[in-house]
């Protein structure tokens, strides 16, 4: 440690050692000697003052830098975003894919349904994604992380298709605004080039208004996990059952069907995209267009075990696309903008829920390493590298 006292003592000791043969007492007491010492000490004192000034300025500067970093890290933007990729993959709408590309995707999904689970014996890798979605439900729904969490979830699912099943293309999406006049007639339900259609109208109800799907590539497929209930309960139980759907049609409830069609119409989605900030956008989106699809399909799709239905991933890819479009309207202000409760405020009703932050770590339910929200805000930065056509 630097010591002013030891520095001055060393300087004087050297001077006295050089006074051999001289009356030291008289010399040290003389005005000439005193003046000489003061003059010789002046540069050293100036140096000391300069060092003190440098130290003080450095401390203040460092404190200011730390203060700015803390402020920015708790805000909605970041000054050092990850480097963007130069050749992003392009996610395309389902009906724009060639029949060959559609078949490759369906085949990869079927592959996941035959690979063994890493969590529970007797279930599949596909089932693990259903369980993980439910396990993290209170963090990934009606919360600030709703959109970022599902973006990461889709990335992990897409990576599983590639790593385990040889899929080489991008995850497709279903733009349901194109079918808002007649959801049940969408080509997504085609038994040959799609995912099969409604549940068997003459069959027994399996769960939540749904019946076994009996056509298409997933006809009579067995799913391992079922939700304990609709609504706020995120829990699932092991309960093998057939993939189930129960479309709302005119004969069921014409008024409800018209309302659901309206929620996914181009004009209604345009209103959502016009929302000025993140919390207004995600709240309007989640409770409006996003929820309309599960309420139309019903069955597995109506609960937190919704990923039992392979169409779920195309639905949420479209949700991600619309968020991406909203971000692209003002990248500087929106790419890293997040706001809302840290957890599902419905599930924690009556309890104080903290504000979500871009620094929050999102639990991924064992599907991947837990990750900070800020890592998935930009689809062309970091490990993400995609955009939408």
Curated annotation (Swiss-Prot):
Residue numbers binding Cu cation A: 141, 150
InterPro entries for this protein: Di-copper_centre_dom_sf (IPR008922), Tyrosinase/Hemocyanin (IPR050316), Tyrosinase_Cu-bd (IPR002227)
Membrane topology recorded in Swiss-Prot or TrEMBL: Single-pass membrane protein
Cofactor: Cu(2+)
Keywords, ordered alphabetically: Copper, Glycoprotein, Membrane, Metal-binding, Monooxygenase, Oxidoreductase, Transmembrane, Transmembrane helix
Pfam families hit by this protein: Tyrosinase
Record field: transmembrane: 53-73
GO CC annotations, alphabetized: membrane
Disruption phenotype: Abolishes the formation of phomopsin A and leads to the accumulation of phomopsin B, a dehalogenated derivative of phomopsin A.
Chain positions carrying an annotated carbohydrate: 220
Molecular function in Gene Ontology: metal ion binding; monooxygenase activity
Enzyme class: oxidoreductase
Positions that bind Cu cation B: 290, 316
Subcellular location: Membrane
Lineage: superkingdom: Eukaryota
EC code: 1.14.18.-
Cofactor descriptive note: Binds 2 copper ions per subunit.
Family: Belongs to the tyrosinase family.
Function per UniProt: Tyrosinase-like protein; part of the gene cluster that mediates the biosynthesis of the phomopsins, a group of hexapeptide mycotoxins which infects lupins and causes lupinosis disease in livestock. Within the pathway, phomQ1 functions as a halogenase, converting. The pathway starts with the processing of the precursor phomA by several endopeptidases including kexin proteases as well as the cluster-specific S41 family peptidase phomP1 and the oligopeptidase phomG to produce 10 identical copies of the hexapeptide Tyr-Val-Ile-Pro-Ile-Asp.
Protein known as: Tyrosinase-like protein phomQ1
Originating species: Diaporthe leptostromiformis (Lupinosis disease fungus)
Encoding gene per record: phomQ1
């Amino acid at each position: 440690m630097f010591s002013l006292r030891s520095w001055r003592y060393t300087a004087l000791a050297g001077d006295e050692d050089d006074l051999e043969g001289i009356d030291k007492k008289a010399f040290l007491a003389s005005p000439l000697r005193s003046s000489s010492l003061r003059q010789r000490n002046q540069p050293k004192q100036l140096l000391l003052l300069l060092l003190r000034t440098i130290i003080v300025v450095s401390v203040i500067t460092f404190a200011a830098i730390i203060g700015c970093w803390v402020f920015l890290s708790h805000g909605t933007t970041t000054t050092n975003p990850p480097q963007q990729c130069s050749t992003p993959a392009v996610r395309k709408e389902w009906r724009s894919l060639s029949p060959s590309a559609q078949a490759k995707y369906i085949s990869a999904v079927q592959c996941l349904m035959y690979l063994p689970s890493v969590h529970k014996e007797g279930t599949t890798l596909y089932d693990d994604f259903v369980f993980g979605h439910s396990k993290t439900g209170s963090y990934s729904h009606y919360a600030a992380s709703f959109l970022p969490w599902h973006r990461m979830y889709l990335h992990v699912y897409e990576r599983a298709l590639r790593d385990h099943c040889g899929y080489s293309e991008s995850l497709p999406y279903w733009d349901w605004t194109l079918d808002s006049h007649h959801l049940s007639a969408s080509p997504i339900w085609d038994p040959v080039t799609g995912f099969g259609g409604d549940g068997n109208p003459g069959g027994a109800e399996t769960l939540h208004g749904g019946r076994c799907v009996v056509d298409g590539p997933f006809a009579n497929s067995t799913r391992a996990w079922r939700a304990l209930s609709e609504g706020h309960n995120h829990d699932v139980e092991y309960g093998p059952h057939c993939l189930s759907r129960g479309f709302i049609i005119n004969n069921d409830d014409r008024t409800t069907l018209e309302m659901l069609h309206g929620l996914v119409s181009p004009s209604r989605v345009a209103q959502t995209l016009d929302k000025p900030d993140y919390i207004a956008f995600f709240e309007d989106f989640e409770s409006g267009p996003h929820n309309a699809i599960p309420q139309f399909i019903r069955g597995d799709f109506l609960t937190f075990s919704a990923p039992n239905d392979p169409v779920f991933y195309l639905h949420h890819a479209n949700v991600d696309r619309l968020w991406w479009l909203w971000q692209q309207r003002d990248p500087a202000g929106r790419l890293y903008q997040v706001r809302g409760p840290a957890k599902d405020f419905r599930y924690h009703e009556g309890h104080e829920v903290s504000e979500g932050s871009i620094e929050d770590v999102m639990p991924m339910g064992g599907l991947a390493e837990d990750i900070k929200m800020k890592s998935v805000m930009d689809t062309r930065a970091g490990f993400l590298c995609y955009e939408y056509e």
